[in-house]
Amino acid sequence: MPQNLAVVIERPDLYTITCNGQTVKAKRNDWWLDKAFGRIGIASVARAGENVVTIKAAPFTMFHELEPAYVLGDFTLKPAEKGFVITPGHALTLGAASQATSPSGCAGWNLQGHPFYSAGVSYRERFDVAKPAGRFIVALPNWYGSVAKVAVNGKPAGFIDAPPWECDVTQYVKRGQNEVEITVIGTLKNTLGPHHGKPALGAAWPASFHQGPNPGPPPGDSYSAVAYGLFEPFVLKQAVK
């Protein structure tokens, strides 16, 4: 059971919340994404198998707008007949072109147990530099995300957000071994949706969220998620005049 397992409820102060019949509450100033999204730890009351989170409002008023609940923690998701099953976490790797594809043409985090993940995933490589002369460029040959952060030897070196998908890191490179870290950032599309009705990538209107499966959650494999990630090793290029 992940020790950081939590459920996020919008405006938790308006409800009585239980997990498996045990009362749980959001701690003050413990929120996620938005200050109205209270993070509620449930590791102490969760169990293997089915878990039920219940929210009650009495009386129910115009301020009680029901919104999705989000489950957070160190775990992965396995597609099931209805939605997903939480399974032990594992490290993400380079996407494989042989798997199901998305805009990048390769498999991303969504097919590695993280279909709703939107934050950053870091990839590291070490490069030996015999002679630090000329310019050094970090290049991403195949990736998909909103932006990629670049760090060299533990120091922030810049961002990659537009073609030709390169970042000049000359001033951070030293003679000998250099560690380069690329952090690919996704977007909130996979987290917030829309997840149903095969929405077009790049479009999200109020009506997009009005479409839902009937009855109940569809198979996990049918959820709409973008394949973010790194699909080929990044490279450190040296340009000498």
Q: What are the residue ranges of the model-derived segments?
A:
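Aromatic-lined ligand-binding clefts that engage carbohydrates, nucleic acids, or primary amines
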Residues: 1-19, 53, 127-153, 180-184
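Surface-exposed coil/turn segments at beta-strand junctions on protein surfaces, enriched
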Residues: 1-2, 10, 33-35, 46-48, ...
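Solvent-exposed beta-strand/loop surfaces of large extracellular or lumenal domains
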Residues: 17-39, 150-166
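Short, surface-exposed tryptophan/glycine-enriched loops
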Residues: 36-52, 58, 167-177, 188, ...
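Short beta-strands within extracellular/lumenal beta-sheet-rich domains
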Residues: 38-40, 117-129, 165-166
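Glycine/proline-rich low-complexity spacer/linker segments in large multi-domain proteins
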Residues: 58-85, 186-238
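Edge strands and adjacent loops of beta-rich recognition modules
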Residues: 87-126
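Mature extracytoplasmic enzyme cores
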Residues: 122-128, 233-237, 241
